[in-house]
Curated annotation (Swiss-Prot):
InterPro entries: Alkaline_phosphatase_core_sf, BPG-indep_PGM_N, Metalloenzyme, PGAM_B_sf, Pgm_bpd_ind. Binds 2 manganese ions per subunit. The gene is gpmI. Substrate binds at residues 123, 153-154, 185, 191, 261-264, 336. This is 2,3-bisphosphoglycerate-independent phosphoglycerate mutase. It comes from Priestia megaterium (strain ATCC 12872 / QMB1551) (Bacillus megaterium).
Amino acid sequence: MSKKPVALIILDGFALRDEDKGNAVTHAKKPNFDRFWNEYPHATLQASGEAVGLPEGQMGNSEVGHLNIGAGRIVYQSLTRVNVAIREGEFEQNETLLAAVKHAKEKGTNLHLFGLLSDGGVHSHIEHLYALLRLAKSEGLEKVYIHGFLDGRDVAPQSAETYLKELNEKIEEYGVGEIATLSGRYYSMDRDKRWERVEKSYRAMVYGEGPSYTSAEECVKDSYDNGIYDEFVLPSVITKEDGSPVATIQDEDAVIFYNFRPDRAIQISNTFANEDFRSFDRGEKHPKHLHFVCLTHFSETVDGYVAFKPINLDNTLGEVLSQNNLKQLRIAETEKYPHVTFFMSGGREAEFPGETRILIDSPKVATYDLKPEMSAYEVTDALLAEIEGDKQDAILLNFANPDMVGHSGMLEPTVKAIETVDECLGKIVDAILAKGGTAIITADHGNADEVITLEGNPMTAHTTNPVPVIVTKQGLELREDGILGDLAPTMLTLLDVAQPKEMTGKTLIK
């Protein structure tokens, strides 16, 4: 029997903005998106700030977006949870954080703090590092070392000096902390199994290997002089006057990894925390008996303590589809596969009964502006086969291109990325319509809508602009005040499935 699938198609990083300058969305030729927008009911959704459980004005991101979409409700994010804990005095009483400090004190070893040095709020927030420094000081710990990952992606590409200046002021104010290594996030926060990058960061932190400098500022200046900006700064070692490293991570040290977003934290965490790690040779000096703390739950694969444990999300979209014996497909390429599976399932790694997953490998290129098409065509071919085979009742699809290429801050490659996705979108939606099905076309956050600032500088961060939503079914009217948490209830309405009470979002269909 022919299925009439309902598909949720997420154009990652594709938001709407009136200003044309630096806007790859308006510059791109996208006849299919425009056709669906003009022919079918459409509206915009809020995908940032309080609408997705973030602080007011905070840009959304893929993890947050997919959590909200899959949960069918506003999910209060780790950034908000940790901020509230700091504000209300709960952070300094967190038993897991205190246990790490106690371990270092009792063993007479060092406490290492590592994470992203910015206030981007996507993977980390520098205020959380400052809170950890205050905690260490209040507990009388003196040997505290910082391994800073430079951002330049969720914030301006050359902003490291600003954050280092502020960090050094805090170190002086609190009387605790010293920078031991610096590394661009390209190396320390890889998520695509490019272990040669992670290894460089690891060896800087453990072996003191890599370019050496007498200060963090000297490291950044030298990198800038060589045309290497924050995200791509080589893992580097800060040295004392005698040329030896300020500190390396050694046996029985304590580590607190203060990033809160899991996807780019897993690989480097496994490198330190897991005894059975085999992805590269860690060498004889690999620190044994580390007390390793993750700020949040990164993955079942990470053997570490968790300071802020997950909030259980019951009756997510995937679970409800499964309970109603509907076949569902999750499909994406590598870069967004965790988002359309793990995050969309509320932090659940396992498949639900009746769930199929298709992972298409992302291309092995240094940066995606070199191949803006990424693997969109391969994703499309795989999905068209599923649609033609009448295999699925519900389809959850992510196209990574607008976001991943948008992060380059380059207009032409991002335009090419959107034009590629538009071509694929046309084929997929037309195939769904031919089966009598319906597509919900939307996005999780902004990015490609501003890749060049009004001043003409590269813009590599996300935006707070609203995202589109199109429902390819005539005779409907959509609300204009929607949020990402309303998408799952909308999909359930189209599938004629009752919405569970845990889903507090509201269908967009009037």
